[in-house]
């Protein structure tokens, strides 16, 4: 099941820096993490869905790039985000 509008709004509200902030790296990483977690469950049932797996790999790569940017620019925010989302590194 895809991430619903209500779930997306809740994620944005939880991770935004200021009111109406939807583009900060923290929000983008949190949204990508929700989509990645959702697709991971999809692949347990649909092992041969290679077309969607390519999209998953692109999302993981985009999340990694955003995390690298955040680590370079704001290390404290990076550390708290990694801990809140339960990601490695």
Curated annotation (Swiss-Prot):
GO biological process, one term: translation
An example Gene Ontology CC term for this record: cytosolic small ribosomal subunit
Keyword Nucleotide-binding belongs to the record: no
NCBIfam families for the chain: S15_bact
Name assigned to this protein: Small ribosomal subunit protein uS15
Role description: One of the primary rRNA binding proteins, it binds directly to 16S rRNA where it helps nucleate assembly of the platform of the 30S subunit by binding and bridging several RNA helices of the 16S rRNA. Forms an intersubunit bridge (bridge B4) with the 23S rRNA of the 50S subunit in the ribosome.
Keyword terms: Ribonucleoprotein, Ribosomal protein, RNA-binding, rRNA-binding
Self-association state and partner proteins as the record states: Part of the 30S ribosomal subunit. Forms a bridge to the 50S subunit in the 70S ribosome, contacting the 23S rRNA.
Superkingdom to which the source organism belongs: Bacteria
Family: Belongs to the universal ribosomal protein uS15 family.
InterPro entries: Ribosomal_uS15 (IPR000589), Ribosomal_uS15_bac-type (IPR005290), uS15_NS1_RNA-bd_sf (IPR009068)
Keyword Ribonucleoprotein (UniProt): yes
Residues spanning the membrane: none
Species of origin: Thiobacillus denitrificans (strain ATCC 25259 / T1)
Gene Ontology molecular function, alphabetical: rRNA binding; structural constituent of ribosome
SUPFAM superfamilies, sorted: S15/NS1 RNA-binding domain
């Amino acid at each position: 099941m895809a991430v619903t509008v209500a779930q997306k709004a809740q994620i944005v509200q939880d991770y935004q820096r200021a009111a109406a902030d939807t583009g900060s790296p923290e929000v983008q990483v949190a949204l990508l993490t929700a989509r990645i977690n959702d697709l991971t469950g999809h692949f347990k049932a649909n092992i041969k869905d290679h077309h969607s797996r390519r999209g998953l790999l692109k999302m993981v790569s985009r999340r990694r790039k955003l995390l690298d940017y955040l680590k370079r620019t704001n290390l404290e925010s990076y550390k708290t985000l990694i801990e809140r989302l339960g990601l490695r590194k």
